Amino acid sequence: MLIITQTALELGFLYAPVALALFLSYRILDIADLTTDGCFVLGAAVSVSLTAVGHPFLAIPAAMLAGACAGLVTAFLQTNLGVPSILAGIVTNTGLYTVNLMAMGWKANQSLLGSDTVFTLLRDAGIGGTWYELLLAVIVTGLAAVLLRTFLGTHLGLSLRATGDNPDMVRASSLNPAFTISVGLCLANAMTGLAGAMVGQYQKTVDINSGTGIVVIGLACLIIGETVLGRRSMTRGVLAALVGSLIYRFIYAVVFYTKIVPVECLKLLTAIIVALAIAAPSIQRWAAFQRRKAAAKGKGGN
């Protein structure tokens, strides 16, 4: 059980920046950014490639910068060329497939066997004992969460939040929604790149298809966290992303080790959970309408 808990905590914190990214793009900006899958692989590819040549620490900010560039492309397509947000993400995600192959030296996968990573360097320094991977994951993700919450309280962060709530009002206030959207998508994809970078070094490998379904998993984590903590404030929203990621990874680890549900079915279950959670308000309205309809028929019969 200790192994399950440790693995779940490690993966939960490592993948949490994806949930934070979706909190920013989906909840704050109200944009369905589908760049996430390709951006995650981009972060991992850049990180693994730089780590393989002896730069594991430089690999982290480089992966974030690459992710931010991907977000900027999506924002440019959306704000300057008038491409709908979903299509803009799909177009960027499609192009990233080739970019990711290029970052990996035109190979479908790349390994770090025999190379030092930020995790192995921490272990060799004797820091954290057997929990060194979890320690680093907590520090990196915790710092990202604190910086995000701090940013959302700044003038630019408030402008970004206002853009998601009412872009017309923002435009009337002499603010440029295109700029705030670009900043938001750059930050969101930088965090996705951070997650990819950390996971790539943690697993010591990257595969061209390793990002498949990441956006759905990130949404599931966010929705699970919001169900537990709610989202009545920015702080709760950020914490919900972290807590949801931990809960999801714990469930995943339990299922993986106990074989309660075939592992192959987990992504299907995740997709169903996300679909039901997003459709919950409509389902509730439909149920309320049916109750009112039944009550009206009952009164009419009397």
Model-derived features with residue positions:
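Helix-loop-helix "hairpin" substructures at the membrane interface of multi-pass membrane proteins
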Residues: 70, 129-215
